[in-house]
């Protein structure tokens, strides 16, 4: 079923339908489309297009559909729907009948897809930040281990001056830190909600778009409807960040491929990231790194293609913009995969310190030290530079290093050279003298490692904030608990009960907005139940439920509670949190009395699970 058709007297040619349909790739926006639809149903309720009963019925069906998609997203591909919006509407109508046809009131696929895409970009962007953080952390850890490992530094792929392996690692940590900053900035700019912009001129209904934006977790609503549906800057910006970061990954890969080669022998990659040859049994090829280098062009191509697509589009929406997704999905997936592989390459890396030191001593890498020595003796640098160049030629002719020339030979190039010259020609001296901020002296490298470690530790990579509930949260908690109770998901709780138990509630929040809640319900000194767990639409599947449950587990431990239990229709979630299934018949009678409040008490489909805190404490003591 198409979302359009009254204007047409003939069906679309099947070849055109295949050409036009986008479900084969935009199915990845299913969860975002459903979340956006839930928020839109609330907006329609606020302007009396939907009754409260209708909105709750739609939301229940959409949440049910969301769970089905989470379990098997590829089921969508069996449909002949035009796009993900059509598919969601078809499924919704299948669940609630003609009521599902009311949901699109005041909404266009133009603002719908713009919202879906921003929701997806925001979620994917946060995962990419975690990927960058993981890679940087891995490299800093390697740097800590190799602060004293001398490595030849190169210019023009010729040995130039000695550095350390830690200093080399930290150079890429700096590059990835700029990528992290760029990505964070891009996510801030895209954090505006287009929903309610309609096809191009805005919705005809008096929707509170700021409230709508807040419901979806956006910083604010977009300010211009025409721009809202035309804007794909965020797509290009994310792909631009990906392209720059892939450039850094490619340079990293190239360095490591060279260092791993038989000619260098500086590092050895683990078997886990290398492959062999079908003909030559001795080969151990750095395929992971070569693929990182090779996939860089693929990401560049996606960015170039996207920019070519939008460069001459008139406002507002045009079908060309359907081409924004495949390149975006592929570019960000590729970037994420390459970061993961790069981190994996560092996980098992072996550095041959003897070989790197030997290489650093070759190539007259201490020539600049000799020039600086002459400058200290009063010779102008340009003249000193020339003298050392002649000395290098002489050493090459002798087949030896500068420090292997006799004092008499060195004095033949400049009479100011004295016996103390040999002290400054050592590798240790070469490193020690580079003591300005950012240099390779041991002190500066140690400082740089320490500072990098501090920056990473201070970085807020936690997407989920959980805190104790406050009295100021009462209205929100009452609304959340009532909502999930009306859907039959949780037991109802009165306002007075929530106020009484406020100290046992925990909430998740984003930028001050409460996005979920749960509480402990204590039966006696040794037993407690997790109740009223619910996460707002738009914030599910982002770790909030897990974080809230873990918070309550920790709180229960602090309160010396011996056992937690939960009654739920989502046992898989709690099994992942290390709960184990138990029989409801084993629960105390006073627990089961509370089931009298449950709207499903006569057709109970809840599963009982428990978490034995006393066993956890005992196992921790044994480990200690």
UniProtKB/Swiss-Prot annotation:
Reactions mediated catalytically: 2-(N(omega)-L-arginino)succinate = fumarate + L-arginine
Main location: cytoplasm
Pathway the protein contributes to: Amino-acid biosynthesis; L-arginine biosynthesis; L-arginine from L-ornithine and carbamoyl phosphate: step 3/3
Stretches for region Probable acetyltransferase: 467-624
Disulfide bond positions: none
All copies of domain N-acetyltransferase, residue ranges: 464-614
Enzyme Commission no: 4.3.2.1, 2.3.1.-
Swiss-Prot/TrEMBL keywords: Acyltransferase, Amino-acid biosynthesis, Arginine biosynthesis, Cytoplasm, Lyase, Multifunctional enzyme, Transferase
SUPFAM superfamilies documented for this protein: Acyl-CoA N-acyltransferases (Nat), L-aspartase-like
GO molecular function ontology, one term from the record: argininosuccinate lyase activity
Span list, region Argininosuccinate lyase: 1-466
Location(s), subcellular: Cytoplasm
GO biological process, one term: L-arginine biosynthetic process
One of the record's GO cellular component terms: cytosol
Pfam families: Acetyltransf_1 (PF00583), ASL_C2 (PF14698), Lyase_1 (PF00206)
Family to which the UniProt record says this protein belongs: In the N-terminal section; belongs to the lyase 1 family. Argininosuccinate lyase subfamily.
PANTHER family assigned: ARGININOSUCCINATE LYASE
NCBIfam families: argH (TIGR00838), PRK12308.1 (NF008964)
Protein name listed in UniProt: Bifunctional protein ArgH
Naturally occurring in which organism (per UniProt): Vibrio vulnificus (strain YJ016)
Name of the gene this protein is made from: argH
